[in-house]
Amino acid sequence: MLAKVNSAALYGIDALRVEVEIDLASGLPQLATVGLPEGAVKESKDRIRAAVKNCGYTFPAKRITINLAPADIKKEGSAYDLPMAIGILAAEELIEKTQLDNYLLIGELSLDGSLRAVRGALPIAMAAKKEKVKGLILPVQNAPEAAVVHDIEVLGVRNLPQVVEFLNGAQSVERVQVNLDDLFKQHSQYNSDFNDVKGQQHVKRALEVAAAGAHNVILVGPPGSGKTMLAKRLPTILPDLTLAEALETTKIHSVMGILNGQAIIATRPFRSPHHTISDAGLVGGGTVPKPGEVSLAHNGVLFLDELPEFKRNVLEVMRQPLEDGNITVARALGSINYPASFMLVAAMNPCPCGFFTDPQKECTCTPLQIQRYRSKVSGPLLDRIDIQIEVPTLRYQELAGKEAGEPSAAIRQRVNGARTIQLQRFHKRTIHSNAQMGAKDIKRYCAVKEDADKLLEAAINKLGLSARAYSRVLKVSRTIADLAGSEEIQSAHIAEAIQYRSLDRGV
């Protein structure tokens, strides 16, 4: 007897339809799985046998062959437990086959027949909609996430008997639906605000400029000056996620299984990996490729604290995602492209002891030690960071001051205004922010007045900026002009942008 059940396989951050074919034949009782199954899929036969028996069904004492088609795509994870079990029962004619073509099934089985959550419910729901199946049957824990996709019937189930009864028409399962507008309102609040930060007005201004133009930032300052606190609040002044951005961000987190019960991610991600992370952990990889931190920070902020402590090869692999907004992971079975459009915020001490620029504590480092410490971060990587800003230690008067800082909402309003100007400027292009401008765009949109040009020339000659750094100054100047509502880049905008090249000036 033969039965076919629809399921799906994850490929990158997308999903592909998989047909689970089950054949029961005479012979010695055994269960063989073919179609490039990974370890967890091969182990599923024991879970399925126990679950079927513990739910009161008879497991067929026959030669069972399960094929996962197409066979050239690697199948991993435990999401095939449910479609395999349903296929076996359908082949034994315990389930009506008429409904099987209408639904796509995923879910991990416990030994008692209950269902556990699986990874990738959102991209699988999108694949089901694309394949024009009627609905998706999956564990109830994954249902809110999958229900974000409209125009498909999402059915959350708790155990194997519930699925069997539903497919036989003996029991109904309530369709899970969510209101996207309510979800956005519920999950779009941040727990921190820029008015939590005392002082550091010039750093806040630099971060406002960075947010307005999507520029990468490096914060240089002694320990305890507030670098991490400022970085964590950067997402609160970035423009709100659009629905398309939220869905793409949620897909990445869904594939990694780290949604933690959320139906959708409605706030900008903030990722802060430890400096001991490997290159595969940062950009993605592994035997079975998975997204790295740069992809988990997609549409948000990637914060690298203690930048010189990261391994040099780890930092160098970030060049591609910083330039292209995506990362390609190549393996023998093919290449997978992950989105990685993020704002990089790095933090570092000015020297090994941390007090080179501190007016109160004396630095104990030699010039050679300082040079070696800073050389751990390569010039090409620093050139890709538009804004370099010093974060000094706060004085007591600033710490003890009771004056409330400007809230994130007020700063975000100005940032939104600048972003609107940029969207109008690039509406016929594939880019959407000043940081993404290429050489032709800079030539077209970053024309400066004569007095501003002379100021820029003097700064370039004195600081010895590279050609890429020169472009960064012009991009930042364009953003400052946008914040000021100015069509032309003026000398004041150039002067402020040059101030954001701290490392070029030796801090």
Give the location of each predicted region.
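Switch/coupling sub-region of P-loop NTPases
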Residues: 192-205, 214-216, 251-315, 320, ...
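Short loop/turn elements that form and flank the Walker-type P-loop nucleotide-binding site
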Residues: 59-62, 99-100, 132, 150, ...
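Peripheral, non-AAA+ core regions of ATP-driven protein-machinery
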Residues: 1-218, 225, 330, 469-470, ...
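Alpha-helical scaffold elements adjacent to nucleotide-binding pockets in ATP/GTP-utilizing enzyme cores
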Residues: 47, 51, 84, 123-127, ...
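Basic, amphipathic alpha-helical bundle interface domains used for macromolecular binding and assembly
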Residues: 40-45, 60, 67-77, 288-289, ...
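Short, well-ordered beta-strand core segments
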Residues: 136, 302, 386-389
